[in-house]
Amino acid sequence: MDIFASHAFDWLVVLLLFGGAIYTLKIIGEEKTTFKEESYQVQFGNLVLEIPRWWTITEQDEHHIKFERTDTRYDWFATFSYFPDHQGKTMPELLEDKLNLENIEYDMDVVFETDSRVLFRDSEIQEQFQEVIRVEGKGSQDQIERIYYDIYLMRALNDHGYFIFESKSSVLNGSLEGPFFEESLACLSFIHETQTGKA
């Protein structure tokens, strides 16, 4: 009993951390079941994004939207960006430019996908975005910071521009928002006159 009494503060810290972990797991578990019911639509150009209700828009202009979790403190953000001119570069060249700009180097074991039929559910999106590259996995930024990075580069048929959609977090947080980012893009669709919910 003396051991517990002499380390009461230490035990209190352990119990608080344990309680916080259980609470976080409970919230995340609820989020996974409520994504479809409680997501909202955000208009981005001629696209409609399905966004989880717990993502907050922290930056927005005509060609860029940034989402963050303002209800938690963990290190994560997602950006959806459109660049009007690809300057004659191929998708692999654009990917290389982006990774060099951000000073990101992936580990060897990454997910790599170029088939729009695998990435998107909507048949119009699959047809229009036949040029797509997705890379997901762990890596390093600035040769120091360990990150989990998921990036989609997409170009529509007959479009001189291209999209970059990215999700970046610490390695430990990569599995928290990553599935929702992937689901958001899997649900990507074009705006139709009957759709509402613009942001």
Features from the language model and the residues they span:
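Long, highly charged amphipathic alpha-helices
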Residues: E50, L94-D97, E183, C187
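Short, compositionally biased strand/turn segments
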Residues: A21-Q41, K168, T194, K198
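Surface-exposed amphipathic alpha-helical segments
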Residues: W55, D159-A199
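N-terminal signal-anchor transmembrane alpha helix of single-pass membrane proteins
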Residues: M1-K32
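Conserved polar/disulfide-associated segments of primarily extracytoplasmic proteins
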Residues: D2, T58-I164, N173, G197
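N-terminal "mature-domain start" segment
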Residues: T33-H64
